[in-house]
Amino acid sequence: MDPRGKRDKHRALLDAKLTELALFAKQLCPAASVEASTIRYEDEDGRVEVFPPPGIWEAEEERIELALAARSAQIFDETGLYIVCAVLDPTAR
């Protein structure tokens, strides 16, 4: 396979997994704002940032973060894609 075809295949897989994680985040917290990005930092392939609504309980925030981290780890094991997921303070946007 030519290098461009390999790169296109990698990008298509990355886009699919970012979409999967973003949809999963919305399932976990429908009221959250979710942003997915392919901007690379260091060794990561992409990132998903979740901004829950103000006033969410800390335990709920942690539940969302742990579920996303587990799914991201599973994706890494299956594909080698390193996608960072974070639940962030909505006022920090």
Would you name each region that the model predicts?
Residues 26-51:
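Short edge beta-strands and adjacent turn/loop segments
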Residues 56, 69-74:
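Short, surface-exposed linear patches
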